[in-house]
């Protein structure tokens, strides 16, 4: 696992043989793969669908972007793509090293470098819009936010021109292989492909600290993290054995967490919609 983290630290990505652990149990899957418990995970099948509008569900060319849906104010640190079946033609992954691009801009286009760090921009994604600088500090290191939608603002247009000069890494990930990408560092995209057989599972993982600097340990969410695993479908018996508690205790944790979340959301619903005191 240390070799894998070293490779991620050095290159920003790694392709490894898929592990036996099923990504249907995403917390345990991430832990077994990289040796670190995530704070949060998001699991999604990536398969082409007829008339899909999103890049994830379509077969169209996908421009460079980051996966930038936040958890507790930060985008996921790691994107994991488990390949069950590659496309017959096309579909290769494209990667661009955002940190290398920043290093170059600091030397050759310092005004744009500063704008990327300081200028809040509207980044449009299918999951919703995000407004923040293109690169921002996350727990002591730089994390990119970049939309696949064409830029219309001056900073975004300049960035698009600069990206055309950057080296592009192209990877054909095959069945039985897993691609890991540092989502804070690397921009990723995909070539168009033909057919409807391409079948991946994507797991996004958020960590308490930057992954390559982290060490083993339990999730910072503690018992709440266990409850979230339970709600995501991990077998209570398996969780109880791992945590050294009874299944009845797990259900007590779940019920308490759900009751407190329900109360908090209902209190939020009772606030006047024009309220801006937060």
What is each residue range found by the language model?
Residues 2, 9, 13, 42-213:
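Active-site environment of non-heme Fe oxygenases that use a 2-His-1-carboxylate facial triad
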Residues 23-25, 71, 248, 260:
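Short active-site-adjacent helix-start/loop capping segments
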Residues 212-278:
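Residue-centric detector for conserved, function-critical "anchor" positions
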Residues 1-3, 25-33, 115, 225-229, ...:
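Solvent-exposed, well-ordered amphipathic alpha-helical segments
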């Amino acid at each position: 696992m240390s070799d894998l983290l070293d490779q991620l630290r050095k290159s920003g990505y790694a392709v490894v043989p898929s592990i036996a652990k099923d990504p249907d149990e995403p917390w345990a899957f991430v832990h077994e793969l990289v040796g670190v418990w995530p704070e949060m995970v998001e699991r999604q099948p990536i398969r082409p669908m007829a008339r899909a509008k999103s890049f994830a569900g379509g077969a169209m060319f996908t421009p460079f972007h980051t996966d930038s849906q936040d958890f507790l104010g930060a985008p996921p640190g790691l994107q994991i793509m488990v390949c069950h079946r590659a496309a017959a033609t096309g579909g290769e992954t494209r990667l661009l090293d955002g940190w290398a691009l920043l290093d170059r801009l600091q030397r050759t286009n310092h005004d744009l470098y500063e704008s990327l760090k300081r200028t809040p921009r509207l980044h449009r994604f299918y999951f919703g819009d995000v407004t923040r600088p293109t690169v921002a500090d996350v727990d002591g290191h730089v994390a990119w936010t970049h939309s696949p939608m064409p830029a219309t603002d001056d900073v975004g247009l300049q960035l698009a021109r600069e990206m055309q000069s950057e080296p592009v890494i192209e990877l054909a990930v095959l069945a039985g292989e897993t691609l890991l990408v540092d989502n804070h560092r690397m921009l990723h995209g995909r070539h168009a492909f033909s057919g409807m057989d391409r079948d991946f599972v994507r797991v996004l993982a958020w960590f308490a600290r930057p992954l390559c600097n982290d060490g083993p340990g339990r999730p910072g969410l503690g018992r709440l993290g266990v409850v979230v695993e339970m709600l995501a479908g991990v077998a209570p018996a398996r969780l109880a054995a791992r945590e050294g508690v009874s299944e009845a205790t797990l259900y007590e944790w779940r019920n308490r967490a759900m009751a407190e979340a329900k109360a908090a959301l209902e209190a939020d619903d009772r606030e006047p919609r024009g309220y801006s005191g937060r």
